[in-house]
């Protein structure tokens, strides 16, 4: 080979070409595996022009017989030209020299100057360089400019072709590509790349595939391990196919859950949640009512809506009218159930004593209310045998006094639409003066009014299995609002009778509450006496405070004197006492007025003597009371 043009090594133009080659060397030396990927002649030839410094610097100057390594070290002392753009004349000579050097090292085996990856790349590049020797410089430059763009599809094709060959390497690659594939679907990637990746993504690592395995889709991974060629033509269809199968399989357990839960509802679960607190704060009466309420509510929620609604018309039979009985609630229940059979029904807790485990047969044959028996059987049929056994055992061990109180407790079940109210409002709470939560008002066209069991002034023990004992007013209202959502509502109420609470006309302060038994006995045996007294109206008022009135927290009650202010004229004269009912004030009747209206009347009175008519209960049978008024 003629190396005459290399003998003039001191020519600055030749040295500039070496600098240019060294400038390209960092780019080409990083990826030595890119050379065999180029099949075209022009591209491989440009690899020859720039590939010599790619990991093989010693072979660049083998024509001079000295390694490039040592010459590059002395390059700092050699005179260099300015870094100007190359001209076609010397650039053509440099290309010819590079072709000669590329073909020559095959016949010059120098172990000190050659490395292992270099001969393999040279063998591939040699034929291509000779085939493209007749190409022009402009074609070479254009091929070099398109080097980066022409390499990407070839390299991507080679990587895709190598993935099916290695099984272990394809799995992590599929997981990595799965995230990229899911992102490409959301961004609207090109359709040419989408069908190539789902076959590796969906079975192994995509989020849709992992979610499909969680509930009960253990059958989905084996088909995902089949060859990828079967899933290749489907494109993005596997995503659409996995979603309906996932929803269908996830809906399977949901449809089965009601039947499983309806068969097994241990009453101990409700005891562990509610009766532990009830045993500490309340009596067995509240615990039994809460158990019945929670058990009935859970059973109603487990039943399909069609079955739970279909039970209601079957409760009363042939419009049976109730007969007279000792309990007023049973008569009210019978008439309400016959008139409003589609709104709900109720059960008296005392009827638990009359039922056996057969759920429909009574222990004793009563000639009483048939419709109440039908409603009782309907409620009992909602309970499981285990729950009913335990309830019957708990009722049997109760004493007679507690059993009498069970007569006043009713479990009312209302059927309604979703979002509809129950038809009554609440009053009282642990944070108010009236600690007991009662029914404040029953709306005329509401569900409670149509059913007929829930009356104004009844104590509300629980709503939908949630006990209201000891709750604040806001918490009770929140429980009442939550009852709007389900189609059924279970309300446990107790009618406040003379035996269960103080007289409605008595005061509810601490002293009167402590003497509840005495107030009851006084009311039953003594007669109220009407007095006419004269009070002194001053700038501060009449010297006492009022309670009760229409629409109060305790319901519609008469206006009574709550307490007498110290230093007032009425205190010194002792003409009035706390608990006295005000009938008339300065010729104005006070019956049926709210407390606010009564105060407006008092404020409008002129200063001076005011004639007042009061009614006071006589305290003659004081000896028969258990405790005396203070």
Swiss-Prot record:
Keywords: Chemotaxis, Cytokine, Cytoplasm, Nucleus, Phosphoprotein, Repeat, Secreted, Transcription, Transcription regulation. GO terms for cellular component: cytoplasm; extracellular space; nucleus. The modification Phosphoserine is found at residue 220. Residues 30-268, 316-343 are annotated as: Disordered. Residues 129-143 have a biased composition (Low complexity). Residues 404-500 are annotated as: Interaction with PPP1R12A, PPP1R12B and PPP1R12C. SMART domains: PDZ. Residues 410-495, 532-617 form the PDZ domain. GO terms for molecular function: CD4 receptor binding; cytokine activity. Disulfide bonds: none annotated. Interleukin-16 stimulates a migratory response in CD4+ lymphocytes, monocytes, and eosinophils. Primes CD4+ T-cells for IL-2 and IL-15 responsiveness. Also induces T-lymphocyte expression of interleukin 2 receptor. Ligand for CD4. Homotetramer. Pro-interleukin-16 interacts (via PDZ 2 domain) with PPP1R12A, PPP1R12B and PPP1R12C. Pro-interleukin-16 interacts with GRIN2A. Pro-interleukin-16 interacts with GABPB1. Pro-interleukin-16 interacts (via PDZ 3 domain) with HDAC3. This is Pro-interleukin-16. It comes from Macaca fascicularis.
């Amino acid at each position: 080979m003629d190396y005459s043009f290399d003998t003039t090594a001191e020519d600055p133009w030749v040295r500039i070409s070496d600098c240019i080659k060294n400038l390209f060397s960092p780019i080409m030396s990083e990826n030595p595996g890119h050379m065999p990927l180029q099949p075209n002649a022009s591209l491989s030839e440009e690899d020859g022009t720039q590939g010599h410094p790619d990991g093989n610097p010693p072979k660049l100057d083998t024509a001079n017989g000295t390694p490039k390594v040592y010459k590059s070290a002395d390059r700092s002392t050699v005179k260099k030209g300015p870094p100007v753009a190359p001209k076609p004349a010397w650039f053509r000579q440099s290309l010819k020299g590079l072709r000669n050097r590329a073909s020559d090292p095959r016949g010059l085996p120098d172990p000190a100057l050659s490395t292992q990856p270099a001969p393999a790349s040279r063998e591939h590049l040699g034929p291509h360089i000779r085939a493209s020797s007749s190409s022009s410089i402009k074609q070479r430059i254009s091929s070099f400019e398109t080097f980066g763009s022409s390499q990407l599809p070839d390299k991507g094709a080679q990587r895709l072709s190598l993935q099916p060959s290695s099984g272990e390497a394809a799995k992590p690659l599929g997981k990595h590509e799965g995230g990229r594939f899911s992102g490409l679907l959301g961004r609207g990637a090109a359709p040419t790349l989408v069908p190539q990746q789902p076959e590796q993504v969906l079975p192994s690592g995509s989020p849709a595939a992992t979610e499909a395995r969680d509930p009960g889709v253990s059958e989905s991974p084996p088909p995902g391990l089949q060859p990828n060629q079967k899933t290749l033509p489907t494109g993005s269809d596997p995503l659409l196919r996995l979603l309906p199968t996932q929803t269908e399989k996830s809906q399977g357990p949901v449809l089965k859950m009601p039947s499983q839960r309806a068969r097994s509802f241990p009453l101990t679960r409700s005891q562990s949640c509610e009766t532990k607190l009830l045993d500490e704060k309340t009596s067995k009466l509240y615990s039994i009512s809460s158990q019945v309420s929670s058990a009935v509510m859970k059973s109603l929620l487990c039943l399909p809506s069609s079955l739970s609604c279909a039970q209601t018309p079957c409760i009363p039979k042939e419009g049976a009218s109730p007969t007279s009985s000792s309990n007023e609630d049973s008569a009210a229940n019978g008439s309400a159930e016959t008139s409003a059979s589609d709104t709900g029904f109720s059960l008296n807790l005392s009827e638990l004593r009359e039922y056996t485990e057969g759920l429909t047969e009574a222990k004793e044959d009563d000639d009483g209310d048939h419709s109440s028996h039908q409603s009782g059987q309907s409620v009992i049929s909602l309970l499981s045998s285990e729950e009913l056994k335990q309830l019957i055992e708990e009722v049997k061990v109760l004493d007679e006094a507690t059993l009498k109180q069970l007569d006043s407790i009713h479990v009312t079940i209302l059927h309604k639409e979703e979002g509809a109210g129950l038809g009554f409002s609440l009053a009282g709470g642990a944070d108010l003066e009236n600690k007991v939560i009662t029914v404040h008002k029953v709306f005329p066209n509401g569900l409670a009014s149509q059913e007929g069991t829930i009356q104004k002034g009844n104590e509300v023990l629980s709503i939908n299995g949630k006990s209201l004992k000891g709750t604040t007013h806001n918490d009770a209202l929140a429980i009442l609002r939550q009852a709007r959502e389900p189609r059924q509502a279970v309300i446990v109420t107790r009618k406040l009778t003379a035996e269960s609470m103080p007289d409605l006309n008595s005061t509810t302060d601490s002293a009167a509450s402590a003497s509840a038994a005495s107030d009851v006995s006084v009311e039953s045996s003594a007669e109220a006496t009407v007095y006419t007294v004269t009070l002194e109206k001053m700038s501060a008022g009449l010297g006492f405070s009022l309670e009760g009135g229409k629409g109060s927290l305790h319901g519609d009650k008469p206006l009574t004197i709550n307490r007498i202010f110290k230093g007032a004229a009425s205190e010194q004269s002792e003409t009035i006492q706390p608990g006295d009912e005000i009938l008339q004030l300065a010729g104005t009747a006070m019956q049926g007025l709210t407390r606010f209206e009564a105060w407006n009347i008092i404020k409008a009175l002129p200063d001076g003597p005011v004639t007042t008519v009061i009614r006071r209960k006589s305290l003659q049978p004081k000896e028969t009371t258990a405790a005396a008024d203070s």
